[in-house]
Amino acid sequence: MKNLITSIALLASVGGAMAQKTVLPEVKVRGQYNANPMQLQELSMDILVMGQTAVTTMEMTFYNPNDRVMEGEFEFPLSNGQEVSRFALDIDGKLREGVVVDKALGRQAFEDIARRNVDPGLLEKTEGNNFRARVYPMPAQGVRRILIAFEQELSQKDGRDFYFLPIASGVKLKHFKLRTEVVSRMVKADIENTLQLNFGQSRNSYISEVKKDNYTLDKNIGLTFPKIDKPQLLTASKGTDSYLYGNIALEKQSLREKEKPKRIGILWDCSSSSQKRDFAKEFALL
């Protein structure tokens, strides 16, 4: 396996267009006073970059430090251009996938299931590009797992394709994992203060993995890639999911005036069903 040493740009701060709100999710306590906040203990991230599209998956473990069962509210802010593609919540220790339904049907399902004191796992879009979901129960001194994935188009920076994920929140994690896979493209460092990673080539992808314990999220994630100037057709697999990506630039078409016809043919209905028509007006039009 050919090893390539490159960098993921983990930025402490960036200005101008890169100044974005933190997208790190959190679980807030609902309806309880004098309660300790929920703690994000573990974060496992998977970033798949294919062509001009990036899919980011975040699996989180939240801990309830209180000595009683709590109700939490999962809040997840996204930046403009990012769209949720997956949501899952653990039920009886296993992640259960959410589904997209009509708003009215989703609210009815939420109320019906909530009456049974079971968490329906309904992800709701609020103002802007923010999302939230009820998390109940949060067991006393226990944990709940939440998974969310979102897609985005790569942005442009200095003539190169750019991926940016602002997660610098200062949260200290017990365990942190980051896996990055870039399909058929070299990835390069672009900003100082970067974490050096070893990318290994596997078939048509470049893959990097990092694991850290007692890690503080004090920097953001940024990746830059050479601009794609030729057509691409790519495939990739993630578990049981397969992805197909095509990037084809269309040639600019020049406009020209359409040539006027020299003769025009007209079909005129003179059957018995046309007896009540005004033939004089039709002949005048012709």
Residues of each region from the PLM?
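Solvent-exposed loop/turn segments at secondary-structure junctions
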Residues: 105, 252-253, 270-274
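Bacterial Sec-dependent N-terminal signal peptides
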Residues: 1-24
